[in-house]
């Protein structure tokens, strides 16, 4: 009996030692990945290579009567690989969030495993307007289980689960931003609404367009604006750098106007999306592209059912009645709702 008991104790001790060794190896691996990721970020866009990053900034005035101003910035750093001859963005290897509201600030880091893009480390630093600081670090194993957590205070604001959920939300957001125009299906079977005569509808759209341009321009000058900015630097290292900027303007009812600009040494692009204030349906889209001295333009006007009633273009060989623009607009709205729901 004594021999059996000693054997059990020895086996338990051996198992504990093995678990400790595995944890130590995992912690060593995470710290190595963290150092390599930071080194890549420092070198991003340097030494003759194109930068590869995405920055999202959302500014919100939460209440016009009580000026609580919410601003959030997300930075994604990623690699590109050639898949079937096309440069394809990989999931980010590192994510940084900066958030502030009325003197309260929060800073987050998320490290992804370069092998399988799973979350392996999260860091959070928060500070109240009174100067109280909270810091938390979470380390995860290959199965996504937290194996170590470190805090500077017992009053932690987060848990291993909440930080991992946040990280996975950021990953989902990154994926949707990359596949804009392809992930939100259109409702093609919804009941038809009564429509206004074409001339009256076009007059209505042009009036709303002028109002939206004026409103968005005024917003740009506001100290406390309501807008979402997305800036993307990408393209392979053997191509000229490209910068894509998307500006989404919204009010308490939702998005009312979007403008997108894409610039590189090879080509330039610009597009606009206008939404009906009451229904938030897309009612007008504009696209302009310039490449090798050629300029292409498309304008689509939509009725109350989302059907194109007028197309103006100088490139009649390539027109889709605004189908892609409608999908892209739906995706922008879905991304905006994701961000609003996540903050709430």
Set out the residue ranges of the language-model regions:
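Sec-dependent N-terminal signal peptides
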Residues: 3-15
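Long terminal segments
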Residues: 21-73, 131-240, 294-344
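Surface-exposed acidic loop/strand-edge motifs in secreted or periplasmic proteins
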Residues: 44-107, 111-112, 213-270, 274
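Beta-turn initiation residues at beta-strand->coil junctions
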Residues: 96-100, 123-126, 150-152, 259-263, ...
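Short loop/beta submotifs within extracellular cysteine-rich repeat domains
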Residues: 104, 117-120, 145-148, 256, ...
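Aromatic-rich beta-strand edge motifs centered on tyrosine
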Residues: 109-114, 135-142, 247-249, 273-277, ...
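Acidic, glycine-rich flexible loop segments
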Residues: 122-136, 285-289, 293-296
């Amino acid at each position: 009996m004594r021999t059996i008991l000693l054997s059990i104790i020895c086996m338990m001790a051996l198992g504990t030692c093995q678990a400790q060794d595995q944890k130590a190896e995992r912690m060593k691996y995470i710290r190595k990945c963290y150092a390599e990721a930071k080194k890549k970020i420092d070198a991003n866009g340097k030494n003759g290579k194109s930068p590869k990053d995405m920055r999202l900034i959302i500014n919100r005035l939460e209440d016009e009567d009580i000026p609580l101003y919410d601003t959030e910035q997300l930075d994604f750093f990623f690699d590109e690989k050639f898949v079937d001859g096309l440069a394809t963005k990989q999931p980010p290897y590192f994510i940084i969030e900066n958030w502030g509201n009325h003197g309260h600030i929060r800073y987050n880091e998320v490290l992804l495993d370069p092998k399988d893009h799973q979350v392996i480390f999260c860091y959070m630093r928060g500070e109240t307007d009174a100067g109280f600081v909270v810091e938390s670090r979470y380390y995860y194993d290959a199965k996504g289980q937290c194996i170590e957590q470190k805090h500077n205070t017992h009053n932690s604001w987060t848990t291993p689960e909440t930080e991992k959920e946040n990280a996975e939300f950021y990953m989902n957001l990154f994926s949707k931003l990359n596949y804009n125009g392809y992930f939100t299906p259109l409702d093609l079977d919804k009941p038809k609404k009564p429509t206004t005569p074409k001339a009256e509808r076009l007059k209505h759209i042009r009036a709303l367009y002028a109002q939206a341009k004026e409103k968005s321009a005024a917003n740009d000058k506001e100290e406390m604006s309501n807008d979402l900015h997305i800036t993307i630097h990408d393209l392979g290292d053997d191509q000229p750098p490209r910068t894509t900027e998307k500006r989404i303007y919204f009010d308490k009812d939702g998005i009312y106007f979007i403008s997108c600009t894409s610039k590189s040494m090879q080509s330039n692009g610009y597009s606009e999306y206008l939404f009906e204030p009451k229904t938030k349906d897309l009612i007008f889209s504009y696209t302009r592209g310039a490449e090798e001295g050629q300029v292409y333009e498309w304008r689509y006007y939509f009725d109350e059912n989302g059907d194109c009633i007028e197309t103006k273009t100088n490139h009649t060989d390539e027109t889709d009645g605004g189908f892609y623009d409608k999908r892209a607009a739906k995706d922008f709205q879905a991304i905006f709702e994701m961000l609003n729901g996540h903050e709430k």
